[in-house]
């Protein structure tokens, strides 16, 4: 890891240092994904079967995982694993239950009632990657808010064979449909539907470059599906002072670096001593990792930054806007009001990022690659939609009419104006009729 003294860098050098590597999808990936999507759209289940055999080397008897298979997977799982997953489920559920919005109803002026109501997205799709290790934590992070939000149908796709842990969590989250489909073909199947796979309104979940590109393409097609957020490499930034434990910091940096060679890890500290100690601790701990080669590649583009104060550390962090932000200082909560841009913040020596990744209760699906400036961590709101309601009485419209008419005239929208005045004229005539009856 490079050690840099912040004050020794020019403004342009500081900007360059904190720039992330460009994410580029080759034309070959774009073309390949377009071909996969078209195959699924045109051939449905048959196309999915063919693509699964081509890319996964598997010919499943059925695309859909049966309830019997899910129960069998649950039976095979150890009690230790079930207990861990249930504890994580409980904590994540508690945090997301607390996010339920309250209805809004306001009388903005006499006779004018405005409301905001929240409804679940009708159908959602969850993509869970395959790979060398199962990711039941991702099922929890996606399945629980979908369940609490009340989405009417939840579809899960994962490359075959689907791990027992994933199927068990799908059962915990009461996911409606589980399919043996991976890659871009899974995204296409959920976005457009097939004979077996239900079309969904929004797709959630991480994946490789092909999955990411497929999500981008279907989200740009009005016939496709919305997606959760832009994707990017995993990253962590640690703010630490002289009170921090360098071994803890090193472990936190490495826990992010082992995700992949494109992961970004950054330490910002006012203490040169801590920077040196962390560099030594990283090297020691690296040798103990099964994914040492991957972590070492990530560390090659990562940074140790020595700032002149904690205030400057905060400024650097806010400019960078990390996915994960760990604050290991003497009084970490004092810095919290100063922190503007981060996906998830971990305060204090005993709040490792791993806790949030798995079981503290917060969601581990987070904006990365600088998107923390405009995107938030995944939550209940992402599985919901807001609708506004307004109801005006006759007197309410009378009171509001002059404002609406004046603004419609200013914008040259005669029909907008007429929609109000025709009602006011009708009300005036009714008033005249009432007066005549009463005379």
Curated annotation (Swiss-Prot):
Pathway participation: Amino-acid biosynthesis; L-histidine biosynthesis; L-histidine from 5-phospho-alpha-D-ribose 1-diphosphate: step 9/9
What is this protein's record name? Histidinol dehydrogenase
Positions contributing to NAD(+) binding: 127, 185, 208
Keyword line = Amino-acid biosynthesis, Histidine biosynthesis, Metal-binding, NAD, Oxidoreductase, Zinc
Specify which residues bind Zn(2+) according to the UniProt entry for this protein. 256, 259, 357, 416
The annotated active site, in chain numbering, is 323 (proton acceptor), 324 (proton acceptor)
Q: What is this enzyme's catalytic activity, as reactions?
A: L-histidinol + 2 NAD(+) + H2O = L-histidine + 2 NADH + 3 H(+)
An example Gene Ontology CC term for this record = cytosol
For the ligand (substrate), the binding residues are: 234, 256, 259, 324, 357, 411, 416
Q: Which GO terms describe its molecular function?
A: histidinol dehydrogenase activity; NAD binding; zinc ion binding
Q: What is the lineage of its organism?
A: Bacteria, Pseudomonadati, Pseudomonadota, Gammaproteobacteria, Vibrionales
Free-text function comment from the UniProt entry: Catalyzes the sequential NAD-dependent oxidations of L-histidinol to L-histidinaldehyde and then to L-histidine.
What is this enzyme's EC?
Answer: 1.1.1.23
What family does this belong to? Belongs to the histidinol dehydrogenase family.
């Amino acid at each position: 890891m490079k050690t840099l003294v912040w004050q020794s860098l020019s403004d342009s050098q500081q900007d360059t240092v904190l720039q992330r590597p460009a994410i580029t999808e080759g034309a070959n990936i774009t073309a390949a994904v377009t071909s996969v999507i078209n195959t699924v759209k045109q051939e449905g289940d048959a196309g999915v079967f063919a693509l699964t055999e081509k890319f996964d080397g598997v010919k499943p008897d059925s695309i859909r995982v049966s309830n019997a298979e899910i129960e069998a997977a649950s039976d095979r799982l150890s009690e230790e694993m079930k207990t861990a997953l249930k504890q994580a489920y409980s904590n994540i559920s508690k945090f997301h239950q607390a996010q339920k919005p309250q209805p809004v109803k306001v009388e903005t002026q006499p006779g004018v009632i405005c409301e905001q109501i929240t409804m679940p997205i009708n159908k959602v799709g969850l993509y869970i990657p395959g790979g060398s290790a199962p990711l039941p934590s991702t099922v929890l992070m996606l399945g629980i808010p979908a369940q609490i939000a009340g989405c009417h149908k939840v579809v899960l796709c994962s490359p075959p064979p689907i791990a027992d842990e994933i199927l068990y969590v799908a059962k915990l989250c009461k996911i409606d449909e589980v399919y043996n489909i991976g890659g871009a073909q899974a995204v296409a199947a959920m976005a457009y539907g097939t004979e077996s796979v239900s079309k969904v309104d929004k797709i959630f979940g991480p994946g490789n470059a092909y999955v990411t590109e497929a999500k981008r393409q279907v989200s740009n097609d009005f016939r496709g599906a919305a997606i959760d957020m832009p994707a990017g490499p995993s990253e962590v930034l640690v703010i630490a002072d002289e009170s921090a434990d360098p071994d803890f910091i090193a472990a936190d940096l490495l826990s992010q670096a082992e995700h992949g060679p494109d992961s970004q890890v950054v330490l910002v500290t006012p203490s040169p001593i801590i920077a040196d100690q962390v560099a030594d601790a990283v090297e020691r701990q690296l040798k103990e990792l099964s994914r040492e080669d991957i972590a070492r590649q990530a560390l090659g583009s990562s940074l140790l930054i020595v700032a002149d104060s904690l205030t400057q550390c905060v400024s650097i962090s806010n400019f960078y806007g990390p996915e994960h932000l760990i604050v290991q200082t003497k009084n970490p909560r004092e810095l919290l009001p100063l922190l503007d841009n981060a996906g998830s913040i971990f305060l204090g020596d005993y709040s490792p990022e791993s806790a949030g990744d798995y079981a503290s209760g917060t969601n581990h699906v987070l904006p990365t690659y600088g998107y923390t400036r405009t995107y938030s961590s995944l939550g209940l709101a992402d599985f919901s939609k807001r609708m506004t309601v307004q109801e005006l009485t006759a007197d309410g419209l009378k009171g509001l009419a002059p404002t609406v008419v004046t603004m419609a005239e200013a914008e040259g929208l005669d029909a907008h104006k007429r929609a109000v005045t025709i009602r006011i004229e009708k009300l005036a005539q009714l008033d005249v009729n009432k007066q005549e009856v009463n005379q």
